[in-house]
């Protein structure tokens, strides 16, 4: 998703100048089983046994909707969203006898959708039309007041990045999936960066004091590490010593995993009936 947005913004032929971020209200809770079964019966009418299986699984939901965290539920919601995304891309306007798409490009992650185009008015029109169609077809509503971004040109971003005052160097960007994406660089979302920085600073003090980090922090360090490698955060990574601390965290996780497997294989574990990965002894 992040890389796709970067490619769209850097392709001059698309002429993208604006972006709007949309979010579906209570997406999984409002996606009903009847809507999903209607789509599946339309797409695969001959797969009767598969339809019965999916319907039986959906009936296990207490409210008759999708459940957050379910593997099948995630794919079924993506199926519903594919119809919404294709409808957005199909919206057009006619100017001087030629058809022009309102949405030039879009990306989606779960219930977050980012639409990009040449005019902000086109994006607003597409959002209103798609919201009405989605509510009528699937019973899903978009949250009002989505974020709107006006991207700067590559030259303007380079000029701002070399200003004297650090506070004036910022550029507007699209905030999606934990990243803030511009044309020439990408940063981490402020709230995520604050939590990641806090964990690496604490880990640095623990490494200086005892030479290792506790297991619970090792998991956090490993999960936050990708935000630094996938963004323009080289100087910050050097300051936080991520390249030194992250391998140490992986060693701690590996040691804990081997200990768990050893206890499990020696039948000293009360959860022995399950797989080693599900063992909760440590």
Which residues fall in each region the model found?
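Conserved polymerase palm-domain catalytic core
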Residues: 3-110, 114-135, 171
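Right-hand nucleic-acid polymerase module
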Residues: 9, 22, 86, 93-97, ...
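Arginine/glycine-rich "motif VI" loop of SF2 helicases in the C-terminal RecA-like domain
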Residues: 139
């Amino acid at each position: 998703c992040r890389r796709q947005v970067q490619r769209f913004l850097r392709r001059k032929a698309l002429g993208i100048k604006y972006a709007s971020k949309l979010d579906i209200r209570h997406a999984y809770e409002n996606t009903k089983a009847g809507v999903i079964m209607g789509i599946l019966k339309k797409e695969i009418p001959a797969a009767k046994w598969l339809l019965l299986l999916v319907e039986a699984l959906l009936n296990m939901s207490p409210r008759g909707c999708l459940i957050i965290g379910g593997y099948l539920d995630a794919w079924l919601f993506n199926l519903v969203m594919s119809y919404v995304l294709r409808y957005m891309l199909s919206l057009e306007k006619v100017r001087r006898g030629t058809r022009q798409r309102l949405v030039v490009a879009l990306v989606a992650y779960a219930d977050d959708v980012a639409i990009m185009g040449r005019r902000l008015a086109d994006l607003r029109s597409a959002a209103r039309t798609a919201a009405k169609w989605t509510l009528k077809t699937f019973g899903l509503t978009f949250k009002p007041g989505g974020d709107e971004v006006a991207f700067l040109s590559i030259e303007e971003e380079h000029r701002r990045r070399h200003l004297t005052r650090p506070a004036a160097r910022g550029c507007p960007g699209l905030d999606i999936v934990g990243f803030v994406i511009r044309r020439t660089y990408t940063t981490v979302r402020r709230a995520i960066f604050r939590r990641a920085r806090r964990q690496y600073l604490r880990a640095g003090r623990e490494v200086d004091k005892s030479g290792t980090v506790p297991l619970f922090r090792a998991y956090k360090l490993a999960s936050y590490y990708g935000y630094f490698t996938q963004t323009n955060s080289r100087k910050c990574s050097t300051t936080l010593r991520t390249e030194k601390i992250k391998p140490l965290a992986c060693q701690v996780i590996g040691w804990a995993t081997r200990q768990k497997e050893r206890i499990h294989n020696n039948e000293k574990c009360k959860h022995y009936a399950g797989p080693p990965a599900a063992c909760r002894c440590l």
